[in-house]
Curated annotation (Swiss-Prot):
HAMAP family: SecB. It comes from Bradyrhizobium diazoefficiens (strain JCM 10833 / BCRC 13528 / IAM 13628 / NBRC 14792 / USDA 110). This is Protein-export protein SecB. InterPro entries: SecB, SecB-like_sf. SUPFAM superfamilies: SecB-like.
Length: 161
């Protein structure tokens, strides 16, 4: 294929996603009923996990993405442990069409952060006296769709990165 004058057209620059930094913004672990919570329990605890993603534009090409993970383990109505983690990264994204930017920031960036957040949580729970909590993989596409549907239902504007 040529561009009309016999020369091949120039290829569009390839999309790029670079991780510039990763860091813990906030970490809290509570073991409010220790040492009794550390004794063998008759049944496994009920564990509830909530995961959210937020993003801030730092510049036209740089974004801070924060993966927030909160969890609580309870047995017989007593809290065994709870935690909150805000783990963030700064990402440079270039040569990506504007219509693809928001999904990239809100799906791929947290997907890159998740293994590190998972390790921090597993270590914090283990250091709190419990077996390490290994979070299940997260469907960031599904989470993104849920958030977009929620925004649309609330009359918000989706698609802003």
């Amino acid at each position: 294929m040529t561009n009309g004058n016999g020369t091949p057209p120039e290829a569009a620059p390839a999309p790029q996603l670079n991780v510039l930094a990763q860091y813990t913004k906030d970490l809290s672990f509570e073991n409010p009923n220790a040492p009794s919570s550390l004794q063998q329990q008759g049944q496994p605890p009920q564990i509830n996990i909530q995961i959210n993603v937020g993003a801030n534009n730092l510049s036209e090409q740089e974004f801070e993405v924060t993966l927030s993970v909160e969890g609580k383990a309870e047995t017989a109505g007593k809290v065994m442990f709870s935690f909150e983690l805000a783990y963030a990264g700064v990402f440079r994204i270039v040569n990506v069409p504007k219509e693809n930017l928001h999904p990239l920031v809100m799906i791929e960036c947290p997907r890159l952060l998740f293994p590190f957040a998972r390790e921090i949580i597993a270590t914090a729970v283990r250091d709190g006296g419990f077996p390490p909590l290994m979070l299940d993989p997260v469907d960031f596409v599904g989470l993104y769709r849920q958030n977009m549907e929620r925004q649309m239902a609330a009359g918000g504007q989706a698609g802003q990165a």
